[in-house]
Amino acid sequence: MVELVISPSLTVNSDCLDKLKFNRADAAVWTLSDRQGITKSAPLRVSQLFSRSCPRVLPRQPSTAMAAYGQTQYSAGIQQATPYTAYPPPAQAYGIPSYSIKTEDSLNHSPGQSGFLSYGSSFSTSPTGQSPYTYQMHGTTGFYQGGNGLGNAAGFGSVHQDYPSYPGFPQSQYPQYYGSSYNPPYVPASSICPSPLSTSTYVLQEASHNVPNQSSESLAGEYNTHNGPSTPAKEGDTDRPHRASDGKLRGRSKRSSDPSPAGDNEIERVFVWDLDETIIIFHSLLTGTFASRYGKDTTTSVRIGLMMEEMIFNLADTHLFFNDLEDCDQIHVDDVSSDDNGQDLSTYNFSADGFHSSAPGANLCLGSGVHGGVDWMRKLAFRYRRVKEMYNTYKNNVGGLIGTPKRETWLQLRAELEALTDLWLTHSLKALNLINSRPNCVNVLVTTTQLIPALAKVLLYGLGSVFPIENIYSATKTGKESCFERIMQRFGRKAVYVVIGDGVEEEQGAKKHNMPFWRISCHADLEALRHALELEYL
């Protein structure tokens, strides 16, 4: 008997040519006697054997487990064949258990797309360029036939699996088989819309509003509120190339700075606040209304109100050009920015630029900023630019702006004011800071006070961190309804607007524009507002 050894896995026996077989120690067994092209009537020589093509014999690939998954295999003609017996390859030190691959019901698979599968166990490393194989996936909608290479499959995270993972071989060892991440095909309900408004009634117990004895330094730290995350239309919002921060389109702009990461049109919710008797208590102190309503001492109330009024106008006159701008009041600080040529103001002498002498008359200075003379308008724009710079520089440190002697007086006055008003401002700041901490929400202030005194109020009451100067509007000349329209033009119709105030004017303006209105008339209203914000009802 002559025996010719062809390869470690192929043996040719001269006595049994009619029973010639190819034995393959791999995951599948191939038998030539069962294939076409081999007959018993004509014995083949060895030379003929190797010159004859066999369409079903595939070249051996190292360590491939093509049929070792224990799954039913389908041929290209979608005909079911008997599964082959799984033999572990010699180089593989472990066996792969048989399991089914379950598809998620919420995913739609189509030929040519990789399925979103969750493989609990890992696979042996396949050579680069492995041809796709056909596999079967069991799902509620039947079977899916698709030639998907493992290189195109993306796996779910463990949180999306409804069956335990196979331990021992993490998928991170085979990055070429799995995508880097998987984005779920659904969106959480919390990101689509806020929680529905609660129908429960707020029952608030009146707590004692006693201010403990504190030093001036500790009180100063208390009123310096923390800065929330930088949000769109908050920190650093200045002039934009095409649309000013007040919402008006600009035909020309001499100055532009880097815009915020997200534009005004990406704001989702805008809270429009009134100032007096909503956020702060000021006018009712001067009239004695607050003292009579809450049983406080009227003399003390009027005294504190007058002292605060003096500090407000002193700051406005000394540092914010109120003497120059009182008769040229603007609705927004950027209303005349288009007349600014961007000149450096570090050495500019405002007291000697002839601003008053060049003005033909105060009655010609309109609210829209229209005034005869290009040179005069440029000087007016310079003043508003300097006001903006001063506000942004000292909005968190007004004590550094007014100086040390006045700073001590201001701290003492603030402490007396909070004690008299039962921490009214503290409650307001809690709600304002909650809104300011949200990434796509913004606080906007609309007040009937002139713009320059309003800015001084905001600084002295410690509100600069929650109200950027671009978000402050004066309704002295046009009314609040007109300001609401400008705000809606600026932030767009898709945003949700909530008006918070105590007066009839803002309530009527909110009703006309279909804006929700939250009335503030007492401490309980502020507490309820803060509670609704904490629960994200607003």
Curated annotation (Swiss-Prot):
Comp. bias regions, Basic and acidic residues: 234-249
Record's compositionally biased regions (Polar residues): 209-230
UniProt main location, coarse: cytoplasm
Residues of the active site: 274, 276
A GO cellular-component term linked to this record: nucleus
UniProt KW Magnesium keyword: yes
TM stretches of this protein: none
Keywords: Activator, Chromatin regulator, Cytoplasm, Developmental protein, DNA damage, DNA repair, Hydrolase, Magnesium, Metal-binding, Nucleus, Protein phosphatase, Transcription, Transcription regulation
Superkingdom field: Eukaryota
Family: Belongs to the HAD-like hydrolase superfamily. EYA family.
Subunit text: Interacts with DACH2 and SIX1, and probably with SIX2, SIX4 and SIX5. Interacts with CAPN8. Interacts with GNAZ and GNAI2; this precludes interaction with SIX1.
Annotated protein name in UniProt: Protein phosphatase EYA2
Organism: Homo sapiens
